[in-house]
Regions:
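Secondary-structure end/capping motifs
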Residues: 115-199
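Conserved C-terminal helix/tail region of periplasmic/extracytoplasmic solute-binding proteins
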Residues: 187-221
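Short, glycine-/small- and polar/acidic-enriched structural segments
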Residues: 1-55, 59-62, 69-75, 90-91, ...
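Amphipathic, soluble alpha/beta structural segments
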Residues: 1, 155-161, 213-221
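Pocket-lining segment of extracytoplasmic ligand-binding domains
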Residues: 57-152
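Residue-level signal for nonpolar/aromatic packing positions in well-ordered secondary structure
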Residues: 4, 17, 34, 63, ...
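Short coil/loop linkers at secondary-structure junctions
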Residues: 39, 44-46, 152-154, 200-201
Length: 221
């Protein structure tokens, strides 16, 4: 759901951001996306641009006010930009870097809790897959319910458009991605980013902190 927006007509491409400030929230999906986008244009995120770290609402406010010429955000903050900055332009979004910059949402548990509560966690997985598949089977209705109950401040049309920027899979598709190692690979990509960005010397590999087996045991082929 991450996007890169600019307001300067002189900025035609990512490469044109060299030497400029870009507001975002570091350590988030928007930051991972921005790093990938800059490197795709042969820009060093640590040397060729100045990344301004702010909470996303503040980053968007800085962009709207003209304090910074670019912002890397996630939806639905793009709605604010489109409403308040007439000349704002989106020059790239995360879909351009999928699956190289794929970021998964999920849940984490302490090892002791995980070991002692596998039946409860299996029930959580089963409930999630049921809701996930029902949502995908009735996407428009699900979007309307979410907007009505959780995102009233976002117009329904904008909310539905925002939902299109995420990638969704059925439980059967997720099972394949878990089984063939794709999900672990996507997690490792994010680990690699934070190892560099956070100067982590010996990060725990995804294969050690991610266990796909409970999902595979719960969601049958």
């Amino acid at each position: 759901t991450a996007q890169l927006w600019v307001r300067d007509d002189a900025v035609k491409s990512i490469a044109d951001l060299k030497g400029k400030q870009i507001a975002t929230t570091t350590g988030t999906t928007a930051h991972v996306f921005l790093d990938r986008a800059l490197r795709s244009a042969r820009l060093d995120p640590t040397k060729d641009v100045q990344i301004v770290n702010q909470r996303m609402a503040e980053a968007v406010t800085s962009f709207v006010s003209g304090a910074v010429p670019a912002v890397a955000l996630w939806v639905p903050f793009d709605v604010t930009v489109k409403q308040k900055v007439a000349n704002a332009r989106k020059i790239v979004d995360a879909s351009a870097f999928f699956p190289e910059a794929a970021i998964m949402g999920g849940w984490a548990a302490r090892n002791d809790f995980y070991d002692a509560n596998k039946p409860a966690l299996a029930s959580l997985i089963a409930a999630w897959t049921e809701v996930n598949d029902a949502m995908l089977a009735n996407f428009d209705a699900a979007a309307e319910t979410l907007q009505k109950t959780q995102y009233k401040q976002v117009p329904l049309a904008d909310f539905k458009e925002s939902m299109k920027f995420s990638k969704y899979y059925t439980s059967a598709e997720w099972r394949k991605l878990y089984q063939d190692g794709t999900a672990t690979k996507w997690l490792q990509q994010v680990t690699d980013f934070f190892a560099v960005a956070g100067n982590i010397a010996s990060p725990v590999p995804a294969s050690k902190y991610f266990d796909p087996q409970l999902f595979l045991q719960t969601v049958k082929a």
